Amino acid sequence: MVAFNGHSTAGHVSAERYLNHPTFGMLYRVAPVAEGRDLYATLYAQRIFFLVTLQSRGASFEVIPLMDARHHAEQNLARARRSGPEEHGRWRQLFDQTFI
């Protein structure tokens, strides 16, 4: 894992969140994974996926394969489906933009 002091910015839609990685640049949040852990992907470069754990001293990044990232995003879609059509629609759009 690589650790650094990251910065996150929440957008007007709950799905829009970004981090700045010191090597790979801007990352965007693809899906929440667990409490304090989210799935992020590179915004500009070749598609690289990270499990990011936010901590008081910064963030730690774990690179994961595409299929693992897709699995986490699909689990998030299933959770969002139970929360209602509006939330599911937002996450579905982000899923489609990322994986399809």
Q: What residue ranges belong to the model's regions?
A:
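Long, non-catalytic architectural segments outside compact domain cores
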Residues: 1-65
